[in-house]
């Protein structure tokens, strides 16, 4: 993980709204109802459900989701007329390992290999 990608991830996570959404996406069955289209885990959560749960407008939620996607913390998938989002668990694990190494004063460079 390079400095630029780390900075994008931290910037995306600096918003309480984006952080909350990401935490919900990590446990979609606990936070969202079953969907007519797409599996909550395999396909992701429909942006409509995210919008309803967070209580913001759809354009605002889409802007937040774009930031998370640009930081490679979520992926998106179109099913019919809707966009579904799911977390990039591998990227989140890399970020977590990077933080642990930094906290332990270990080599951060070695944590991304």
Regions found by a protein language model. Name each.
Residues 1-2, 50, 75:
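Short hydrophobic/aromatic segments of transmembrane alpha-helices and their interfaces
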Residues 52, 63, 69-70:
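Alpha-helical residues within the helix-turn-helix
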Residues 34, 70-79, 86:
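Beta-hairpin "wing" of winged helix-turn-helix
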């Amino acid at each position: 993980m390079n400095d630029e990608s780390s900075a994008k991830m931290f910037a995306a996570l600096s918003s309480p709204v984006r952080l909350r959404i990401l935490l919900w996406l990590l446990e979609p069955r606990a936070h969202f109802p079953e969907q007519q289209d797409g599996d909550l885990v395999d396909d992701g959560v429909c942006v409509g459900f995210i919008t309803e749960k967070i209580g913001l407008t759809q354009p605002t939620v889409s802007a937040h989701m774009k930031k998370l996607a640009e930081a490679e913390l979520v992926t998106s998938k179109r099913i019919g007329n809707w966009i579904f989002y799911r977390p990039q668990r591998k990227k989140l694990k890399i970020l977590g390992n990077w933080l642990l190494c930094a906290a332990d004063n270990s080599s951060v460079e070695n944590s991304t290999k």
